[in-house]
Amino acid sequence: MSDIESIVEKLSSLTLIQAAELSKRLEEEWGVSASAPVAAVAPAVXXDVAVAEKTEFEVFLESFDAKSKISVIKEVRSITDLGLKEAKELVEALLKSLRTGVSKDEANELKKKLEAAGATISLR
């Protein structure tokens, strides 16, 4: 039996506690770490490749000022073409998407209108 086969056989017979102790002792003896290496970040690709900018956004109603609830409902109705009851339910539910798949400019315009009415809006 070769030395390597002998070592493999002995290591295979170790218990988990013994293997952990062996690992710790070898780290101390050799000055190395058994932890997984950290992945390096890939270098940036040449400047010819443009970074893809997000083109479609989703407008979310995060919260609203209680005093301006009616204004927010009116604005939601005008944006979504919902009826009064549906718009009220949507506003009261919070954290709901008001519009999806809108352009950046349209999303920012909707955000301005809703914030002027007293809502807190996020774009995703």
UniProtKB/Swiss-Prot annotation:
GO biological process entries: translation
Any one GO molecular function term: mRNA binding
GO cellular component terms, semicolon-separated: cytoplasm; ribonucleoprotein complex; ribosome
Coiled coil (residue ranges): none
Pfam families assigned: Ribosomal_L12 (PF00542), Ribosomal_L12_N (PF16320)
Keywords, sorted A to Z: Ribonucleoprotein, Ribosomal protein
Family the UniProt entry places it in: Belongs to the bacterial ribosomal protein bL12 family.
Role, per record: Forms part of the ribosomal stalk which helps the ribosome interact with GTP-bound translation factors. Is thus essential for accurate translation.
Subunit and partners: Homodimer. Part of the ribosomal stalk of the 50S ribosomal subunit. Forms a multimeric L10(L12)X complex, where L10 forms an elongated spine to which 2 to 4 L12 dimers bind in a sequential fashion. Binds GTP-bound translation factors.
Cited PANTHER family: 39S RIBOSOMAL PROTEIN L12, LARGE RIBOSOMAL SUBUNIT PROTEIN BL12M
Protein name, as recorded: Large ribosomal subunit protein bL12
Taxonomic source organism: Liberibacter africanus subsp. capensis
